[in-house]
Amino acid sequence: MTADEVVALYKEDGALLHGHFLLSSGLHSDTYLQSARVLQYPGHAARLCAAMVAGIPDDLRRRISCVVGPAMGAVLVSYECGRALGVRSLFTEREAGQMVLRRGFVLAPGEGVLVVEDITTTGGSTRECMAAVTAAGGQVLAASAIIDRSSGFSDFDGAPFFPLLKLPVLTWEAAACPLCAAGGTPVKPGSRGLS
């Protein structure tokens, strides 16, 4: 999939939103990518995730035996990437504020894992998911996302990162947000903090 095709799919599904948003990272932005609107269509989810894993070098891809993504946003992404790779898919959840594998999910010692996300901004959720994988005995081989909106600022502790699309989107700390300065109030469309 080309960058233009990914953006077109997000636009077609009403998933590329403009306004004043409070992101899961705590940053503010005038653009929000609501991946759930794209992932609600199985064909779109399958196409995006197959393209994600196709971007991982063959030698690395062959070593992946499990895909893990943080709930909520990456549950479907993990599943579809696992299906595209022919491996199982797990997800992490918050327990006492920390990402962990629950529901009886286990990783074999040293099992090769691909950690996935729908969107990365600071990479915080991805790093938390990676820590949960490591704590469970897995080996993080790489990370991937449908869209990296970090402008290259995401760092995954040396693990290679293979986003399908790099999309520079403006973000601000709350104190520096021009939309807040103009009297606007951000909306929080993401899933972090939901109970």
From Swiss-Prot:
Keyword Magnesium appears in the UniProt entry: yes
Pathway participation: Pyrimidine metabolism; UMP biosynthesis via de novo pathway; UMP from orotate: step 1/2
Reactions that this protein is recorded to catalyse: orotidine 5'-phosphate + diphosphate = orotate + 5-phospho-alpha-D-ribose 1-diphosphate
Molecular function via GO: magnesium ion binding; orotate phosphoribosyltransferase activity
EC top class named in words: transferase
Protein origin, superkingdom: Bacteria
Record key words, sorted: Glycosyltransferase, Magnesium, Pyrimidine biosynthesis, Transferase
Gene Ontology biological process terms from the UniProt entry: 'de novo' UMP biosynthetic process; pyrimidine nucleobase biosynthetic process
Cofactor: Mg(2+)
Enzyme Commission numbers on file: 2.4.2.10
Binding site for 5-phospho-alpha-D-ribose 1-diphosphate: 117-125
Binding site residues for orotate: 121, 149
Keyword Cell inner membrane: no
Family to which the UniProt record says this protein belongs: Belongs to the purine/pyrimidine phosphoribosyltransferase family. PyrE subfamily.
Function: Catalyzes the transfer of a ribosyl phosphate group from 5-phosphoribose 1-diphosphate to orotate, leading to the formation of orotidine monophosphate (OMP).
Oligomer and partners: Homodimer.
PANTHER family listed in its UniProt record: OROTATE PHOSPHORIBOSYLTRANSFERASE, URIDINE 5'-MONOPHOSPHATE SYNTHASE
HAMAP family, per database record: PyrE
Designated name of the protein: Orotate phosphoribosyltransferase
Annotated organism of origin: Acidithiobacillus ferrooxidans (strain ATCC 53993 / BNL-5-31) (Leptospirillum ferrooxidans (ATCC 53993))
This protein's encoding gene: pyrE
